[in-house]
Amino acid sequence: VCIVLVFASLSISVSPLNSALTQYDRHATSDLVEAVSGERIMQTIQDLQDFGSRAFYLDSSEEVASYILGHFQAMNIAAEYQEFMAGIHSVKNVVATIPGTSASAPHFLFGAHYDSENRYVRTASDGQMLPAPGADDDASGVACVVELACVLSNLRLQNTVRFVAFGAEENGYDSSGRMAGSRSYVESEKAKGTSYDACWILDMIGYGGGSENHTVVVVNEDSTGLGSDMQEMVGALGIELSIVVESNSSLLSSDHASFWSAGYPAALLIESDPTTGAYQFNPYYHSAEDTIDKLSEGQIVAVAQGLVATLMGISSPESSNEGGLVLISVTIAIGSASAVVVCIYYIKRKVKEK
């Protein structure tokens, strides 16, 4: 069931970030930031963990893809599968799209991988036997992407916004994964001539390690602005999130690498960088102990809020009514997994003078 009540429209066009805070009503952005729900995020993580293992070569992989697709569709966001092969395994990406008002405008993308892995797996049988709950790696990222879709589902930008859950990011027992899903997606986008202004990949964002709410934003020479943009908006809105921006083109172990290789501006958001020692690496990585009780809800919420603020920071209003109430009530039941999603937020903003 999905109920959407909209009492005002919202139309946004893209402008440079350095003028965003003077052009964009800070209160509207703050309202969207406050709409991010830790309860919804943690419920999605729990649901994904409850699948036991989400290895891309298991039957559960298709069940998880269906679960994620159902989330997007229940928000009235157009969503579809993109099928690809990882070795001998047929796997699916889940792609949701909020279309922009300008077909020629570059796209934005939020992505995370939904498969998980246990480091002790050597055969397909091992994969069936050994748990890989993957709460941090990477249910945390997927839950954040789903939450961003919920909060942004009634906004209209000139730019199209994509939300993608990638399959087969992990190696797999036969090493046929290795970011096969994101590579397939990027190859398809390049073939279609799709351009992107910003791609944010979220991978392991929930482990706090006893530190304050934080994230490491890994960029390369083509995407340095994505880190500074996020720092600026988080600071401007007082979001409690410490951000370390690292230009590290040698860190290629997640889906952002597929976008870098295609020349797309992309940033990896991750809780630590083991190559530089920035923050504590999750010691439960790729084990049966990577569970939801090890995660910081506040940190994941802050990351989601920072991304909402960043997206709004590179947008400016075209026109709008004085205010509006948006209510989304979503109930999803797919197989043994269920979730209740409720988005309520009030948007108040001024009409931009021409």
Q: Could you tell me what each predicted segment is?
A:
Residues A198, I205-E318:
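Active-site-adjacent substrate-binding region
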